[in-house]
């Protein structure tokens, strides 16, 4: 998270939030903070008021993911390496990847139709990325969200880059 990335102290944070739907491969998340803050959220946050508890299987998945992250720090290092590698390749080819420094890379396409064309073309070549269009992003800032994993090989990163570069050329993005 942000505190870990910047080498900060969680004790200095007023509130800590985490989703379990990305690196933990599950659903749900948590919010931690001062008891007064958490009490306020419990009683005033509409999405929380009507939400259900996480299923036990998903909690077990999160616990196991945490154990792996703690016991195998090389996975986190590899994840960062893979994200940096793909981002540098995309930027070097002329793609707009915004200011993200995470392994989830936004590839800005701009136009909704081109975004879906590139998404479909990548999918047909065996590369899965997520299209994100307005209103989830500002108008004319549609993008593909690319998620790198620690387990991706350099060959897979190169394959992803080649598919995206091919479609970027076809659509006049680069």
List where the protein language model places each region.
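PLP-dependent enzyme catalytic core of the Aspartate aminotransferase-like
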Residues: 124-127, 136-174
